[in-house]
Amino acid sequence: MKIHLLSGFLGSGKTTAIQNACGELTKKGNKAGVITNDQGIRLVDGDLFEHLNIPNRQVMNGCFCCNYNDLDNSIQSLIETNKPDVIFAESVGSCTDIVATVIKPLLKFRPETQVTFSTFADVRLLKMLLQKKSSFDESVRYIYFKQLEEAEIVVISKIDLIDANSLEEMKQLIDKRYSDKIRLYQNSFDTANIRQWLTVLDNQPVTNPSSLPIDYEIYGEGEAKLAWHDQQLEIQSMSYNAAQATNGLIKTISQKIHFNEYPIGHLKFLLNGEKKISLTYTPQQELFDTIADKKNNSAGLLINARVQTSPETLSHIVSEAIKETEIKFNCKILVKSHASFQPGYPKPAYRITD
């Protein structure tokens, strides 16, 4: 069995790639399982994989490295229950030091398993960081570039969202900076690109990659700069405009964060357990996939927001957006669950160096 481990910063496109790769594998008669990972306890991506009937497990309340035993138990559970040919394991986007804390323990404790390692990077954010135009804190940037430094395979994602000239310039920079790595330029909605990535993974030889020196003080500081906000809402409307209100709430949250110039890791929303909307850190946001044309009197919305600010500030922004939406759309928004926090200091269960 193979485990395809994915790293990469928040909003880098890991989940989309996994979702479409699972679809391609299923067409070929292969069984795939997924393990998602987050610092919180309710994850948009986990709910989405459930809706798509893709066998999955979730490692919550911390990264793979700090919850390695939970990761191992999740692998075993998928093997016993679903017997997958391939497992995709997606590490939380604020995590690095994957080789020493996840890959080497996997190779030690599961020597029969083949492990590949891909790190994803949104081409637009990478361009901003290389040009020093991003407002992410230096400690957050440290995590970002360590993720790329330790990768075997670098997947430059979302290339469809950048113009051809800029992409060519980025290719020249990336090919020079990461010449020692396999480099893929990918639109994960493009079937040919997904098939190319899967081919690279299939042909990747078994290796024992080298661990990186990691300054855990900077690493911990970087994680602590990011606020996590998870919230489950129910939107109720006697005017049958719950969909419009939900769309308005999503836009208001995004606009308030951008107005305050807080760098966004990602904003993920899941409507009624099945429709996902993702927004990231770039000034030119992707177009909203509008949901405002549906007429219904209630809607469920799960929010996962990861933003460089304090948990209190992020929680206040969402609360104000809820109040404004209730007034504007004459609706009632009920909070079913809510958690705002900063990730704790990284304390890996294992750290195997060379």
Q: PLM features: residue spans?
A:
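Short acidic, S/G/P-rich loop/turn micro-motifs used as interaction or catalytic elements
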Residues: 94-95, 126-127, 161-162, 239-241, ...
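Canonical P-loop GTPase G-domain recognition
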Residues: 141, 145-223
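P-loop NTP-binding site
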Residues: 1-6, 11-12, 16-17, 203-354
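A short acidic, often aromatic-flanked loop/helix-cap motif at beta-alpha or helix-coil junctions
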Residues: 63-66, 189-195, 341-345
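Helical mechanochemical/support elements of P-loop NTPase systems and associated helical scaffolds
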Residues: 2, 67-70, 98, 140-147, ...
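Nucleotide-state-sensitive switch-loop elements of NTP-binding domains
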Residues: 2-7, 12-142
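Short, aromatic/basic amphipathic alpha-helical patches
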Residues: 46-53, 168-176, 317-324
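Structural motif
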Residues: 37, 91-93, 159-160, 189, ...
